[in-house]
């Protein structure tokens, strides 16, 4: 199935008929998610054969990874069994034969060097022992494999003026991370940090703030958000080419070090 990012949600049996039609026409109806897709997916480019989406939620990133990397097998791991079941059914209906889902905890994954690429998007802020989770993701990668991790920044710009601590979202154990802090924790987990940057430029942050004012973390005011979403999406899209020196999200690309070469006998 091809189309706008997240259009696979139109196949979700747990959504209403209106929600399915809306997703078919406009893709995933979540402005923040669409911003993250635009910012994170380019960091996943490469000739990957096995990809892990750690903490995949409803599966939208997994679907996009499966389409972007048709040569790869994509596994989405999620703690909520209902989301796993629904994402699995969506992948089946969409014909994404290279995408599957399992129930799992990112702090307790039992994969040893299986994946070329691990993606973790807005997940670590939910995990109390985040360094342990990072070490688990390291073990899941083959030596030389790549991690693309995105998290909320500790602070965000409120509307167009000033900064304040990021949104207090239910389920978050911390508001977010500063880029140097996240990079240091990844190094503690024995990753080599390749690149670190902030995401969400001014226009993207502005529209994301408005989205949150309308719908909050509990997706309230769905009718109002359905009307506002196309405008918010269009405005945020104009900010896609910005390269913010500071923003409301943090994106880091890292790698698992190669195994040391053991010298042969003299």
Model regions: which residues?
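Conserved N-terminal segment of class I S-adenosyl-L-methionine
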Residues: 1-113, 117-121, 131-134, 175-176, ...
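A short His-aromatic
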Residues: 122-126
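A short glycine-rich, Lys/Arg-flanked "PGG" loop and its adjoining helix->strand segment in the class I
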Residues: 131-146
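Short alpha-helix
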Residues: 174-189, 196
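Conserved catalytic loop of SAM-dependent methyltransferase domains
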Residues: 194-220, 226-229
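Conserved Class I S-adenosyl-L-methionine
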Residues: 223-253
């Amino acid at each position: 199935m091809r189309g706008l990012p997240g259009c696979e949600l139109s196949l979700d049996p747990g959504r209403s008929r209106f929600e399915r039609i809306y997703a078919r026409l406009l893709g995933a109806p979540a402005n923040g998610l669409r911003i993250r897709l635009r910012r994170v997916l380019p960091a996943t480019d490469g000739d990957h054969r096995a990809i892990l989406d750690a903490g995949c939620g409803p599966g939208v990133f997994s679907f996009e990874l499966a389409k972007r990397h048709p040569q790869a097998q994509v596994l989405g791991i999620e703690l909520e069994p209902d989301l796993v079941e629904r994402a699995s059914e969506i992948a089946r209906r969409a014909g994404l034969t290279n995408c599957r889902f399992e129930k799992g905890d990112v702090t307790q994954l039992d994969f040893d060097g299986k994946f070329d690429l691990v993606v973790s998007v807005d997940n670590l802020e939910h995990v109390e022992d985040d360094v342990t989770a990072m070490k688990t993701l390291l073990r899941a990668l083959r030596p030389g494999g790549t991690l693309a991790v995105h998290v909320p920044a500790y602070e965000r710009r409120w509307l167009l003026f000033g900064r304040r601590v990021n949104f207090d979202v239910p389920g978050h154990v911390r508001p977010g991370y500063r880029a140097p802090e996240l990079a240091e924790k990844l190094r503690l987990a024995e990753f080599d940090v390749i690149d670190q940057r902030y995401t969400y430029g001014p226009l993207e942050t502005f529209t994301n703030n408005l989205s949150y004012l309308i719908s909050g973390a509990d997706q309230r005011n769905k009718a109002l958000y359905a009307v506002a979403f196309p405008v918010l999406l269009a405005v945020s899209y104009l900010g896609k080419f910005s390269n913010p020196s500071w923003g409301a999200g943090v994106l880091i690309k890292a790698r698992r070090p190669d195994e040391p070469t053991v010298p042969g006998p003299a």
